[in-house]
Design a protein with these regions (language model features):
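Residue-level detection of the helix-turn-helix DNA-binding "recognition helix"
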Residues: 17, 31, 42-44, 71
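The DNA-contacting recognition helix of HTH DNA-binding domains
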Residues: 23, 34, 44-45, 63
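A short, Lys/Arg-rich alpha-helix, primarily the initiator
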Residues: 1-18
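Alpha-helical residues within the helix-turn-helix
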Residues: 17, 28, 57
């Protein structure tokens, strides 16, 4: 499970920064809070299915791309 959370965090941070979106702006856009995005990116919490779908839709990235399972770790 820890490997999955880390992969999600890295992918989310990468997509967000590539698009020059700060955590707070992303959080507002998806109806969350900046602390939640920060915690996901630091692997302190995992995203719920609902939050994952909102992130995917807003960032225009398939859920499968955003939530990558790195089985080698």
């Amino acid at each position: 499970k820890e490997g999955i959370i880390m992969a999600v965090a890295n992918t989310l941070r990468q997509v967000r920064t590539e698009r020059n979106i700060c955590q707070e702006d992303l959080a507002i856009a998806i109806g969350s809070c900046g602390r939640t995005i920060g915690r996901i990116e630091r692997s302190e919490r995992s995203a719920s299915l609902e939050l994952a779908l909102r992130l995917s839709k807003y960032l225009d990235v398939a859920v499968e791309e955003l939530f990558v399972l790195d089985e080698e770790k």
